[in-house]
């Protein structure tokens, strides 16, 4: 049993199988008290199952789960003292915002004065002051999700679990709520785990990211660690855009990079484009230019037929004045290679 009081959640060798499908396999995870951790992975990676195991909504086939130092493996959902927010709000449609937030407090028989004070505090915290008498149907999707978060926080849970909380919202609202959630967490400091398949969301919000694939943890680290030092080919290819090339590609023939394994991963922003030949470049031709707003994407074709995607800042693109069919010279600034079939 963990003794460290700074540990909010400890998952030890947890596995879960549904029929013949191994949803979670031998997962170990430590979440520090007060931190915000993202479970990130594609569909079927096991991230939502792991969250439900922590919540007590599923029971592990093997392994132990500790919450704030105590063994909670066999505890009921109620006894775990968690707040849970689903993707689809799950608000009571017939209750006002204020009554939705108060629901858990009233179940616990708090006094009317205490309930009223806590609800008003939370309305201010989630920036919904003045909307307490509205019904969920009178709110936007983003506002409804804030109500769901306020309701989860009302009972002062030791752990807050969020299952793709912004997945049902449009892109602009999602981005606004990501920033808001980070600020909210910095105010309340509740140990929080949230599930997402959105790499940008995880990078922007989380203190630590747990990258999952096929029920296993591929890597745990800060957003910078995950991006700059991916532990496996899956992490490299899942976190951000990447070109995957054979190490025999012409772009590596000019030297300068160590690519000992057959497969090489090259980020689009790590490709340098020049108009004139410079050391360690190889000739290429522009296939296509795509304007992404904040940057420009250039698709370049090497002499061996390999097509690379490169990203350039807008000012660099303007300096180069790139056009389709133009001959250019390219070189990789850095790249990563892994042994074939490499995994942790």
UniProtKB/Swiss-Prot annotation:
Residues 9-239 form the ABC transporter domain. It is a peripheral membrane protein. InterPro entries: AAA+_ATPase, ABC_SmlMolc_Importer, ABC_transporter-like_ATP-bd, ABC_transporter-like_CS, Mo/tungstate-bd_C_term_dom, P-loop_NTPase, Sulph_transpt1, Transp-assoc_OB_typ1. SMART domains: AAA. GO terms for molecular function: ABC-type sulfate transporter activity; ABC-type thiosulfate transporter activity; ATP binding; ATP hydrolysis activity. GO terms for cellular component: ATP-binding cassette (ABC) transporter complex. Its main location: membrane. Keywords: ATP-binding, Cell inner membrane, Cell membrane, Membrane, Nucleotide-binding, Stress response, Sulfate transport, Translocase, Transport. Induction: By sulfur deprivation. It catalyses: sulfate(out) + ATP + H2O = sulfate(in) + ADP + phosphate + H(+); thiosulfate(out) + ATP + H2O = thiosulfate(in) + ADP + phosphate + H(+). CDD domains: ABC_CysA_sulfate_importer (cd03296). It is found in: Cell inner membrane. ATP binds at residues 41-48. Its EC number is 7.3.2.3. Part of the ABC transporter complex CysAWTP involved in sulfate/thiosulfate import. Responsible for energy coupling to the transport system. The complex is composed of two ATP-binding proteins (CysA), two transmembrane proteins (CysT and CysW) and a solute-binding protein (CysP). Belongs to the ABC transporter superfamily. Sulfate/tungstate importer (TC 3.A.1.6) family. PANTHER family: SPERMIDINE/PUTRESCINE IMPORT ATP-BINDING PROTEIN POTA, SPERMIDINE_PUTRESCINE IMPORT ATP-BINDING PROTEIN POTA. NCBIfam families: 3a0106s01. This is Sulfate/thiosulfate import ATP-binding protein CysA. It comes from Synechococcus elongatus (strain ATCC 33912 / PCC 7942 / FACHB-805).
């Amino acid at each position: 049993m963990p003794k460290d009081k700074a540990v909010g959640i400890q998952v030890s060798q947890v596995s879960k199988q549904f029929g013949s499908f191994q949803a979670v396999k031998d997962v170990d995870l430590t979440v520090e008290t007060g931190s915000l951790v993202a479970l990130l992975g594609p569909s079927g990676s096991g991230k939502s199952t792991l969250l439900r195991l922590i919540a007590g909504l599923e029971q592990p086939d093997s392994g132990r789960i500790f919450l704030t130092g105590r063994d909670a493996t066999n505890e009921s959902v109620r006894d775990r003292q968690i707040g849970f927010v689903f993707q689809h709000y799950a608000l009571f449609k017939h209750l006002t915002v204020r009554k939705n937030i108060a629901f858990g407090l009233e179940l616990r028989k708090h006094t009317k004065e205490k309930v009223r004070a806590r609800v008003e505090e939370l309305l201010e915290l989630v920036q919904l002051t003045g909307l307490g008498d509205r019904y969920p149907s009178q709110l936007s999707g983003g506002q409804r999700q804030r109500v769901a978060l306020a309701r989860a926080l009302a009972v002062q849970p030791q752990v807050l679990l969020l299952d793709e909380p912004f997945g049902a919202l449009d892109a602009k609202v999602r981005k606004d709520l990501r920033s808001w959630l980070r600020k909210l967490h910095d105010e309340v400091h509740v140990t929080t785990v949230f599930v997402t398949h959105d790499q940008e969301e995880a990078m922007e919000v989380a203190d630590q990211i747990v990258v999952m694939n096929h029920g296993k943890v591929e890597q745990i680290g800060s957003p910078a660690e995950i991006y700059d030092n991916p532990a496996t080919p899956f992490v490299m290819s899942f976190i951000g855009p990447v070109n995957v090339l054979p190490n025999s590609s012409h772009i590596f023939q000019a030297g300068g990079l160590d690519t000992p394994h057959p497969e090489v991963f090259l980020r689009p922003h790590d490709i340098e484009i020049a108009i004139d030949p410079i050391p360690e470049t190889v000739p290429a031709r522009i296939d296509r230019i795509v304007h992404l707003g904040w940057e420009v994407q250039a698709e370049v074709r090497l002499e061996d037929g390999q097509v690379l995607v490169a990203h350039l800042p807008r000012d660099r693109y303007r300096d180069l004045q790139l056009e389709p069919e133009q001959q250019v010279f390219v070189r990789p600034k850095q790249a990563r290679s892994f042994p074939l079939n490499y995994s942790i």
